[in-house]
């Protein structure tokens, strides 16, 4: 059974969209399952309805000029004098055809179509009862053959032959028309027509599946008279056709048990009871004479569609399942169309957003490139400005360093040139140099010689008695002055351990100590001269004693038990040995004393986070000099107080032979010496005792 489709749902244009193009996978495989058997017939019928072309053009002769097709239900103007009326009989009985044939044969000659008349062929079939929807039962097709012959005496017989239709469901009709221009020169012609007959649908039917009925081939042959078989030359004009009386012979055709075809008739034709159906002939007719007649065009097959007849069958009831299934299919198609439309709109929206984002990205990239270029320009300008300021800073720093180097460096312009050194000293490694601050009690003149020689020729070597080189103090005296000066005060405070002190304060302290040492040296040089002058004045005042004359001659002089020969000792030999014994350092002030009359005071408290402190209080000026100006020298004592931090304490051993003779002389002890050590000699004056230093330190 063919699938059922409602015309109202198919014809509604609002239920489908232009983009509703389903692929073969979207359709159900069973949609056309019922149409497999009648695919060929259905295609033929639907093609004729849609294209409005009733006949197949493939069967036409391409050598002929074919006129454009016309509607199949319009009368053809080719043969206006020919009207075929056919009444096919039922396949069950042939009585109707026999009666019709007898009726046609008994008609008077006046009713036989002649020249200018129309031949009527009537084909009737039982009309089915009226129905709304359903199937039309199969009705057999037959082949009708009509032979019309013209003669001078009587009418030609018209034979009707029914033959089974071909499987292609097409009715072929061949008509042979034999005519002559005159009774003596008849015109012979032959026409082959293709006739397609359909049973009309009853009025009131909307849509149904009509089974393919058995179509027949109608062949109409019009032959010449027997006396015209000799074949004379055709005349110049076409004679009118005078057919013989029609004799119909029917041949029953059994019904065909083949596949049925479905036909859809949108507008049925109403059958008039008084008017017989008209056979429609469309297309050119080729007429070919027989015998020696001139050549004529080849016959052409044309399709004849008879008027539809009412049917006798009623379609069964509509299947509800198929209807629901068809509705579901339509809904599925609609939903698929909507989903595709939504997907398309979504993709279009995504494309629009993508284009907008790409445009924004390009704009941001351009802005980023512009900002980078501006940043590079600003960085280049900033680097140029920094480079200029850096150059100025470098120049200022270099000028400051040069100023320091020329004023306080080793090549300072204010520093005197160093004393020349002997080649032997230049070859040897430099040893640490030290400044010695000391004093000695007044004694013979030879006690001051070592200091004077050291002051006059500093840095020179003096060979000892054993042949070893002896080293002197390398402290230089500028301008040959006989006072102890520092070589360079700036170099004494440039060491790493003194950088945390105030430089100005350090220089001030160094100047104070240097002045104190110089005043002490000048005082030691003045005291011996005054003592010698006093002794000379006392000797002048005393008269020499009178010696008595001995009674006996003097004998040989007595010798000292010490020895006959006294070796000469260089007065400055012990000075370098003494400096080496105390391990003198050039950046340190030394106070050396061999007397034990100093006062020692211990510290009451001590800070464990700092070094022990020590204060030295010693005479600052000579006995007859004053600095403060507070009064006569006898009222006040000028003392120098030195604040120190104890760095280290140790015990050293000095040979007695290395001690200078001026410091080695020990006076007789006095009862007031509580320390038990040697005290200064009694020959020393009180002023000289007052000039001795006083050591104050904690134990």
UniProtKB/Swiss-Prot annotation:
What GO molecular-function term can you cite, just one? DNA-binding transcription factor activity
Q: How does it sit in the membrane?
A: Single-pass type II membrane protein
Q: Which residues carry this modification: N-acetylalanine?
A: 2
Which stretches does the entry tag as region Basic motif? 324-344
Per the record, where are the segments of Pro residues compositional bias?
68-78, 545-556
GO biological process terms held by the UniProt record? mitotic chromosome condensation; negative regulation of ATF6-mediated unfolded protein response; negative regulation of gene expression; response to unfolded protein
Which residue intervals are topologically Cytoplasmic? Answer: 2-393
In this UniProt entry, which residues are annotated as the site Important for cleavage by MBTPS2?
407, 410
Residue stretches of biased makeup (Basic residues): 519-529
The superkingdom of the source organism is Eukaryota
Q: Where are the transmembrane segments?
A: 394-414
Q: Name one GO cellular component term.
A: nucleus
Provide ranges: composition bias, Low complexity.
Answer: 86-109, 680-693
Where can this protein be found?
Endoplasmic reticulum membrane
> Mainly localized where?
endoplasmic reticulum
Listed A to Z, the keywords are:
Acetylation, Activator, DNA-binding, Endoplasmic reticulum, Glycoprotein, Membrane, Nucleus, Signal-anchor, Transcription, Transcription regulation, Transmembrane, Transmembrane helix, Unfolded protein response
Q: Which residues lie on this side of the membrane: Lumenal?
A: 415-699
Residue positions with a glycan: 473, 502, 607, 624, 673
Query: Site Cleavage: which residues?
Result: 437-438
| CDD domains, sorted | bZIP_ATF6 (cd14700)
Instruction: Specify the protein name.
Output: Cyclic AMP-dependent transcription factor ATF-6 beta
Give the species: Mus musculus
What taxonomic lineage is listed for the species of origin? Eukaryota, Metazoa, Chordata, Craniata, Vertebrata
């Amino acid at each position: 059974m063919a699938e059922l489709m409602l015309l109202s749902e198919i014809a509604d244009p609002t239920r489908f969209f232009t983009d509703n193009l389903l692929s073969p996978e979207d359709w159900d495989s069973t949609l056309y399952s019922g149409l497999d058997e009648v695919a060929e017939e259905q295609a033929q019928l639907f093609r004729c309805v849609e294209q409005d072309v009733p006949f197949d053009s493939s069967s036409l002769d391409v050598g002929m000029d074919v006129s454009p097709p016309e509607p199949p239900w319009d009368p053809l103007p080719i043969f206006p004098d020919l009207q075929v009326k056919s009444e096919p009989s039922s396949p069950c009985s042939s009585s109707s055809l026999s009666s019709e044939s007898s009726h046609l044969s008994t008609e008077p000659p006046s009713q036989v179509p002649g020249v200018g008349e129309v031949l009527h062929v009537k084909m009737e079939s039982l009309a089915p009862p009226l129905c709304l929807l359903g199937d039309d039962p199969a009705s057999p097709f037959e082949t009708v053959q009509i032979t019309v012959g013209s003669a001078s005496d009587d009418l030609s017989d018209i034979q009707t032959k029914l033959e089974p239709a071909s499987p292609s469901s097409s009715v072929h009709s061949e008509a042979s028309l034999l005519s002559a221009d005159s009774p003596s020169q008849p015109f012979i012609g032959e026409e082959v027509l293709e006739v397609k007959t359909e049973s009309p649908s009853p009025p009131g039917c909307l849509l149904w599946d009509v089974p393919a009925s058995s179509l027949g081939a109608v062949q109409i042959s019009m032959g010449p008279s027997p006396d015209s078989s000799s074949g004379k030359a055709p005349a110049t004009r076409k004679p009118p056709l005078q057919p013989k009386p029609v004799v119909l012979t029917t041949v029953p055709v059994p019904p065909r048990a083949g596949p049925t075809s479905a036909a859809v008739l949108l507008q049925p034709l109403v059958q008039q009871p008084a008017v017989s159906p008209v056979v429609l002939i469309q297309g050119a007719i080729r007429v070919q004479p027989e015998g020696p007649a001139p050549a004529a065009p080849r016959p052409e097959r044309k399709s004849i569609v008879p008027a539809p007849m009412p049917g006798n069958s009623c379609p069964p009831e509509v299947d509800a399942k198929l209807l629901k299934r068809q509705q579901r299919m339509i809904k599925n198609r609609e939903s698929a169309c909507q989903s595709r439309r939504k997907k398309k709109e979504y993709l279009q929206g995504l494309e629009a957003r993508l284009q907008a984002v790409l445009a924004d990205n390009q704009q941001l990239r351009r802005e980023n490139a512009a900002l980078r270029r501006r940043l590079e320009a600003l960085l280049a300008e900033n680097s140029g400005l920094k480079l200029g300021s850096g150059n100025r800073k470098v120049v200022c720093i270099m000028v400051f360093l040069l100023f320091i180097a020329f004023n306080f460096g080793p090549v300072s312009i204010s520093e005197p040139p160093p004393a020349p050194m002997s080649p032997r000293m230049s070859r040897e490694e430099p040893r640490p140099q030290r400044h010695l601050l000391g004093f000695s009690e007044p004694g013979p003149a030879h006690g001051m010689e070592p200091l004077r020689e050291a002051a006059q020729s500093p840095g020179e070597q003096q060979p000892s008695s054993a042949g070893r080189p002896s080293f002197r103090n390398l402290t230089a005296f500028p301008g040959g002055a006989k006072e102890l000066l520092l070589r360079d005060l700036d170099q004494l405070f440039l060491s790493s351990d003194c950088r945390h002190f105030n430089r100005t304060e350090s220089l001030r302290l160094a100047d104070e100590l240097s002045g104190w040492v110089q005043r002490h040296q000048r005082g030691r040089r003045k005291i011996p001269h005054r003592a010698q002058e006093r002794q000379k004045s006392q000797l002048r005042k005393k008269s020499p004693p009178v010696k008595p004359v001995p009674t006996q001659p003097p004998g040989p002089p007595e010798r000292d038990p010490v020895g006959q020969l006294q070796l000469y000792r260089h007065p400055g030999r012990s000075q370098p040995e003494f400096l080496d014994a105390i391990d003198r350092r050039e950046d340190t002030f030394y106070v050396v004393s061999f007397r034990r009359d100093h006062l020692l005071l211990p510290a009451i408290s001590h800070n464990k986070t700092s070094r022990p402190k020590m204060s030295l209080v010693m005479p600052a000026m000579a006995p007859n000099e004053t600095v403060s100006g507070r009064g006569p020298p006898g009222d006040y004592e000028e003392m120098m107080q030195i604040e120190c931090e104890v760095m280290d304490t140790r015990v050293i051993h000095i040979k007695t032979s290395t001690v200078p003779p001026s410091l080695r002389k020990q006076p007789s002890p006095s009862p007031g010496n509580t320390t038990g050590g040697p005290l200064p000699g009694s020959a020393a004056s009180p002023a000289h005792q007052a000039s001795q230093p006083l050591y104050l330190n904690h134990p």
